């Protein structure tokens, strides 16, 4: 294993093999030439926006033009966004991006309300759908017809489109307040030699610091700063929810939550199953927390406090080179079969991945979307040589391979998979890597670290996101009914009530010296239109697929690739999973997921008992 990852001052200094191959997207042309093609294709679509409904042949021809337009759009978006990601202050690509945004929105405004035109020709299109040439468009068109009952008058819809750029976006106000204007104070070391300003970027690293006073002052000062603005934060969240509630009820939805579920054609029963099964499995989560607390107190000879939960019990300083990380990912995924492995090797050799952190590069990691028609499913990361970075590479490769199999198997109109399904393949890859690393590692501390990270991932995704989702669900429903819940006191009361249902730790949420943690009004995800439950579902489903693989072997992997990875968006999410052997309305699927999770906890406890005596 390598000890250090070489640092580079400029992106251009990074070796070519560790950078994106973005010139591939241009195919020998310039970006301005692609813009010219974009304008040419957009003019054709605008010209035929009404005449294409004259007969089925004209309509089919227009759909082909739209697909060509979308393929070009994908290349342009991939080229611009990836270039900006590797240097977020690059003025050249920012200007290019602004130019394209203007072109795109100009097209969008001229093309107008396509759904309205579809509805005006509903009778005609319904007959055309009997033609097999329109089979791949049936899902989207049927959804437009089904959505008709939730549309307002043509004049109102036109007005809403025209004034949309003036909409107040409260999540942006929330972001400015919490990212820039809140003063979180300083973390102070026990000896007084370190004084570190607390911000969103360093908060969790400070909570992992070996110095208890750094952790304590980070925890308390963060909470105090947030609590100081609790009424402002409450007002922002309440107004955001109220706006969405008013819109949903005006459009004839039975509730705000059902307006969100409608987009994925999900029944509310799925939420009830999720909330009931996760909260009823509290004992499994408690098993982890009780043992973690025991190990912590044995190691540190002190009572565990709320600011101690992120302190690592073991320090794993193993470092991996990019090539070693690639090798680990390949070996862990070997059971996936020859096509899967061949494509991952191609991803590494053909420069799908931009690996190394440099100044002004976007933080975090992603596997890019809008990939149909593009062979390279680009991945950005900030590789630092840690086990976590190896896991990130495997995770993002899961997304990219999902895109590869979906794009290869499905027509363009059905190739894109929704957020509801997006995290399953990436988490599945993490589980493959976890078990491979446990198998080959001989170091107990490394194994303990791997298991703990996997458990925390499950807890953070399933337990926390489900709690948050039921809280959102409850708050939306109260606002729909007109209940007066617009103050911090009322909102916090709701959050505390839901928290008690899921409570697994006996640690205090706040300290006598401290203002209360106002988490119920201070989570950015609450501004993302009720989607955190999808993260929990993704983790549950990935664990079910993985448990099936452990019980059934390679046959389960072939089924997973053919029925899930290759499905794209060919059907609604629940139906795709049902076809892949997982019925989300059957509460028994949670038993399989928690079985796999509890096996991981058992391994964690077994090794922890050896390390902390």
Swiss-Prot record:
Alphabetized GO MF terms: metal ion binding; metalloendopeptidase activity
UniProt cross-references to InterPro entries, sorted A to Z: OligopepF_N_dom (IPR013647), OligoPept_F_C (IPR042088), Pept_M3A_M3B (IPR045090), Pept_M3A_M3B_dom (IPR001567), Peptidase_M3B (IPR004438)
Disulfide bond annotation, renumbered to this chain: none
Cofactor annotation: Zn(2+)
Matches recorded under Pfam families: Peptidase_M3, Peptidase_M3_N
Keywords, in A-Z order: Hydrolase, Metal-binding, Metalloprotease, Protease, Zinc
Catalytic residues as annotated in Swiss-Prot or TrEMBL: 396
Binding note for cofactor: Binds 1 zinc ion.
Keyword Zinc: yes
GO-annotated biological processes: peptide metabolic process; proteolysis
Source organism superkingdom: Bacteria
Coiled-coil regions listed in the entry: none
CDD domains in the cross-refs: M3B_PepF (cd09608)
Enzyme Commission code(s) on record: 3.4.24.-
Family annotation (Gene3D superfamilies): Oligoendopeptidase f, C-terminal domain, Oligopeptidase f, N-terminal domain
Positions bound to Zn(2+): 395, 399, 402
SUPFAM superfamilies recorded: Metalloproteases ('zincins'), catalytic domain (SSF55486)
NCBIfam families (UniProt xref): pepF
Family: Belongs to the peptidase M3B family.
Protein name, as recorded: Oligoendopeptidase F homolog
Record organism: Mycoplasmopsis pulmonis (strain UAB CTIP) (Mycoplasma pulmonis)
